[in-house]
Amino acid sequence: PATGAVLAKASSPSYTHADLGTIIESGTGSQLVDRTTQALYSPGSSFKTITLSAGIDTHTTTLDTTYSAPGTMELGGGTIHNYANEDMGTIPLREAFARSSNTALAQLGVALGADNLVSYARAFGYGTALGQDFSTTPSLMPNPAEMTTWELGWASCGLPVGEHASPAGPQTTVMQNAVVAAAIANGGVVMNPYIVDRVLSPEGAVVSTTSPKSLGQAVSADTAAQVREAMLGVVESGTGMGARVPGVKIAGKTGTADVENGNFNSFFIGFAPYDHPTLVVSVVIEGNGENVLGYGAQVGGRVLAQCLNIQALGAAS
């Protein structure tokens, strides 16, 4: 989180050199797309991390502010609903975030306003071609002047529903989601990711070294600390319990986004260890006809556990 160094990334489906000719001839090319950096996704509730950050940073809300979180509600001439239309009653924001209430977070987004929501998304990297030594498709947000109240409510929950000249948003890459989680773990400072640590000559001499590069302070350190606390609640007692790892505190945020043909994608962003984060993970599992509800958190937890073990072995060697 403190440097932006990318330790690993994986995209599936992939390909081998032997398959390349067949893939090109088929004209599909799906395997050639690096889904970590080039594919844009509706982030679902993982975007609520930005909504919560903006709400706290602008003093629009606090973690203890209570919200009515009905199963469905009318907003701006349209309907906002929780998953399975669950009525959560009147609850504090920290619980609404942990349980991922759309109706509560939509109210926060409307109170925040479109200008603020889009501005904070951009502060976290939206609209930027992230990467010091690789290319990333910029994540998208609408022109705030074109957003309706209903669209703003859903955008605050990570679902792009707008139809206007500017792109519907939010739309994000897996890498952008990692940058958001890393910024929260890093006291609100956004780091530009990179893959190559250093370049060596054939003789082993250091030719160049990549220096960490900040993209700015998205939110204050105090705001980041409060959002970290809320993200801990997601994994400890909310929708992200599947990411729990024995003996390690993990903080994160889940997300689910409907896609075409009744499918949906499962997201998880998180970091560990909670008190002194050294690792960040960003996961999207595409449904493609399978029920992947909650699977993003399970995969994220397993990835963090394995990487923490590797770090521990490296420190001990």
Where are the predicted features?
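Beta-lactam-recognizing serine transpeptidase/beta-lactamase-like catalytic domain environment
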Residues: P1-S45, I50-I285, V292
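Short, gly/Ser/Thr-rich active-site loops of penicillin-recognizing serine hydrolases
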Residues: A205-S211, A297-S317
